[in-house]
């Protein structure tokens, strides 16, 4: 994401990322969010909110001016939850689903992925599609990460309607 959004990444990384990456960065941010210094907690939450908004809204026509924050307490809560998952590797081992796909039931599966999703790259959806016999895979060229984006919402509704017809 930082290669596609260099300006947003630079604003974020100047103060918070530095040379930290991945888990090390998540732990650094998490400690700032859980510390007793309320001003530092607010700064970390605002910075994370702006960066994550730029990433998840990459497919939109413009970057949100100040992130998705809303009120400060919401931004702090959201950042704490996101960092809690990040420092715990999202409570799932790498490739867990693909490595255990044989244990999943055989059910109709439609995989819909935003082509401009830089949070979860379309390659992951493709790998899942190849592992699930009979699945369908659709990349929405201008779709991003958020299911609330019109193109993604419409495709999800069509897929759900299709499943309802198949199972009726």
State where each predicted segment sits:
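Beta-sheet entry/capping signal
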Residues: 108-110, 136-137
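Active-site-adjacent alpha-helix of alpha/beta-hydrolase-fold enzymes
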Residues: 122-136
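Catalytic active-site module of serine/aspartate enzymes centered on a nucleophile-bearing elbow/loop
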Residues: 135-168
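Short beta-strand/loop motif that positions the catalytic acidic residue
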Residues: 104-105, 111-113, 117
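Alpha/beta-hydrolase
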Residues: 2-100
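Alpha-helical elements of Rossmann-like donor-binding domains used by nucleotide-donor carbohydrate transfer enzymes
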Residues: 28, 47, 81, 127, ...
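Conserved alpha/beta-hydrolase "acid-adjacent" motif
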Residues: 93, 118-124
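Short, conserved loop/helix-junction motifs that constitute active-site signature segments
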Residues: 102-106, 131-132
